[in-house]
């Protein structure tokens, strides 16, 4: 549990927005995974970042175990929330 809290402290507000979106939309397996453009469409304009910044955040969260890559959608990578990401969201509520 200590390790999780340390990782959670490194979470940014934008990471949190992405995780909460994936959790609320129940994007929790490779078949339901959504691409970066779809993620950005769902995030409010005031909180939205660029495509490349979003990609970097998703890559970081993937390395930490919060999200995983889903099935490829055309040429686009897709992402879904993993168990650690769900646990983080649950701990925030």
Where are these regions (language model features)?
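Short amphipathic alpha-helical interaction segments
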Residues: 48-63, 76
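Short, cationic-aromatic polyanion-contact patches
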Residues: 72-93
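A short, conserved structural fragment
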Residues: 62-72
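Short acidic, hydrophobic short linear motifs in intrinsically disordered regions
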Residues: 29-43
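Short, conserved alpha-helical segments within structured domains
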Residues: 14, 32-35, 54-57, 77, ...
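Short alpha-helical segments that sit at the start of domains
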Residues: 1-30
């Amino acid at each position: 549990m200590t390790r999780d809290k340390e990782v959670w402290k490194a979470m940014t507000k934008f990471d949190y927005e992405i995780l909460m979106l994936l959790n609320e939309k129940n994007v929790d397996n490779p078949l339901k995974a959504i691409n970066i453009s779809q993620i950005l469409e769902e995030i409010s304009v005031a909180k939205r970042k660029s495509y490349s910044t979003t990609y970097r955040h998703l890559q970081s969260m993937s390395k930490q175990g919060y999200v995983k890559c889903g099935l490829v959608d055309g040429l686009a990578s897709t992402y879904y929330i993993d168990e650690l990401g769900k646990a983080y969201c649950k701990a925030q509520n």
